[in-house]
């Protein structure tokens, strides 16, 4: 099953069943707070990591830490 952070009507972070975390954008200040809380809650890192993944067009495997192009 996927884990999805949805802010308003937008899927912002998606963690696939095989562990790939993708951030689709940073959007509004409120959404950035949601991203930060989500990353802390699930132990995936922090907002800065999600922002870096988005800006660099990358995805991260939450099981291995591998970061590859999205």
Task: Kindly label every feature range from the protein language model.
Residues 1-70:
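Terminal leader/tail segments of proteins
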């Amino acid at each position: 099953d996927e884990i999805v952070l949805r802010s308003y009507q937008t899927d912002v972070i998606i963690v696939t069943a095989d562990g790939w975390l993708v951030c689709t954008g940073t959007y509004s200040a409120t959404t950035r707070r949601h991203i930060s809380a989500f990353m802390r809650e699930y132990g995936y890192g922090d907002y800065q990591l999600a922002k870096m993944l988005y800006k660099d067009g990358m995805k991260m495997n939450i099981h291995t830490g591998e970061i590859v192009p999205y």
